[in-house]
């Protein structure tokens, strides 16, 4: 999860239906996978972080980028579950999963909503995974795909326990994040290269389990009951999205 976001679920059996929101691919070992890919994730959120970085610079008290991200992300944890009736659409480009043909980043709030910094950034972080939830709900509700745990990876998870908790809340399942979560796609390609050279006849899954991820430090968070009401607000507003 970074500039874009996607989820890949290895399936026990083929999907019963066809859905434009779902891509059916395979693992390198040939196992069937349902993939939900969304074009937009953290770019709009990053733009807002940059705005507050500029403000800190103007105030004469500049804040280093990692510290600024941590400050704003952790503050989002103190926001209301419904983000004070603040809703963010982070579509810098079209988002087919949500039916949006063109990018139109926007935010909305009700006149009587509780608009503050914590709720704004909670809504911004929710927006990074809202379109993903639309596709995942198809798998959960129409295909009865069950998931015990999802492993989160990407820059969105660099600040420990924030996006991870919101994703667990939104998808209704446990989310684990490894120590290497902040590494990008180049790291994954390096693992495949290492497997090609050092696989020793093992399957890719066996190699990863025995050579790469064994003993890897990770944390797992469970969904909280009322944790993602803001994501529900975004879904209620779906017809509005389709009018972009």
Task: Describe the residue ranges of each PLM region.
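Glycine/Thr-rich phosphate-binding loops that ligate phosphate moieties of nucleotide
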Residues: 9-238, 243
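Phosphate-binding/catalytic loop of phosphoryl-transfer enzymes
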Residues: 1-9
């Amino acid at each position: 999860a970074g500039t874009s976001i996607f989820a890949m679920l290895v399936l026990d059996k083929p999907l019963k239906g066809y859905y434009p929101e779902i891509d059916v691919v395979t693992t390198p070992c040939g196992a069937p996978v349902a993939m939900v890919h969304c074009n937009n994730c953290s770019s709009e959120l990053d733009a807002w972080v940059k705005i507050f970085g500029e403000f800190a610079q103007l105030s004469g008290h500049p804040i280093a980028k990692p510290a600024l991200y941590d400050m704003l992300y952790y503050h989002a944890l103190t926001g209301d579950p419904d983000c004070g009736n603040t809703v963010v659409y982070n579509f810098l480009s079209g988002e087919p999963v949500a039916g949006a043909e063109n990018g139109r980043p926007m935010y909305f709030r009700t006149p009587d909503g509780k608009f503050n910094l914590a709720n704004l950034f909670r809504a911004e972080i929710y927006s990074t995974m809202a379109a993903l939830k639309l596709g995942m709900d198809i798998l959960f509700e129409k295909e009865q795909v069950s998931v015990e745990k999802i492993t989160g990876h990407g820059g969105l998870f660099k600040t420990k326990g924030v996006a991870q908790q919101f994703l667990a809340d939104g998808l209704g399942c446990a989310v684990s994040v490894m120590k290497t979560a902040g590494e990008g796609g180049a790291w994954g390609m390096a693992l495949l290269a290492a497997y090609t050279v050092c696989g020793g006849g093992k399957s890719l899954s066996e190699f990863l389990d025995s050579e790469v991820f064994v003993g890897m430090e990770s944390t797992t968070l469970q969904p909280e009951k009322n944790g993602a009401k803001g994501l529900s607000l975004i879904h209620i507003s779906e017809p509005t999205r389709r009018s972009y």
